[in-house]
Amino acid sequence: METVSPEFVIGGAERLLRVSAVSLTATAAELREESGAWLADPVVGVSRAALGVILDDVTGYVVAAGAPSNRWPVSLGIRLDLLGEPPIDGSVLTAAGRLIARDDTSGTTRGEVVAADGSVLALITQRSHLLTVSEVPTTPYIDVPVPGPEVSLREALALREVEPGVVELPANPYAANGMGNIHGGVLITGMEFAAMSALGAAGELRATSIDTAFVRPADARRSTTFAARVRHRGRSVSVVEVTATGGAGKPCGIATVMVRPAPEAE
């Protein structure tokens, strides 16, 4: 069946995180992202999970580029290994993704994002499932101005701590992907914020891995709640389970978040 190289869809999440395409093929892809002070946060320190947007895209689009023209990939699971601190100085980050395996219904991809100095900040493994679609996603029109660089990620997404360990993401066009659902990378970011809230973090902890299963789409036009449960708390490592529940009251994502002290706090 015919395959068509997809347009890189600049959804709300891509605009918010300043993500752009360099190259997209059925075997490899490269994207870029502008860093900035919006990644800093008083609770999570610097949002490492926000790298999930570019990493989800750079691996997911490899599967999309090799899929039949009436199929589109959605993520079943993403594992992020978060190795370093995203810079906040305006430097450009580069992400690369590559195909590991593909069949008629799914694809597996891996990738990484590196800083301008060549240091690896994060790794991803993604498993995707192909859906039959009447038309592939296209770049949506958003009539709300993109938040400026002085607006933090927490503020731009209007993330709100309901109580310790419970964080709410209201309806927000800048949380969405091209299909109108909450972007996988934004869901992962919510997982990070909820996990840190449950631990009572104040900038001294960092997420080192986030392993997320996506069990159903989350409509970006409705609120999503992230509820965290601490499974282990220790001086060297803590483990938190986070469940994201969509507006229909059903889980849309379940994650295990591993947290360690920030390097300067060890």
Q: Whereabouts are the PLM-identified features?
A:
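Hot-dog-fold acyl-thioester-processing enzymes
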Residues: 30-63, 169-197
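Non-catalytic linker/capping segments at the edges of enzyme domains
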Residues: 1-38, 125-174
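The feature marks the first
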Residues: 15-16, 20-27, 33-38, 49, ...
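HotDog/MaoC-like acyl-thioester-processing domains
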Residues: 61, 73, 86-148, 216-221, ...
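Hydrophobic beta-strand-centered segment that forms part of the acyl-chain substrate-binding groove
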Residues: 43-46, 60-94, 99, 195-225, ...
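Preference for bulky hydrophobic residues occupying beta-strand positions
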Residues: 33, 78-81, 111, 169, ...
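Short coil/loop residues immediately preceding or within conserved phosphate-binding loops
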Residues: 16, 77, 108, 209, ...
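Structured core of small recognition/catalytic domains
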Residues: 167-253
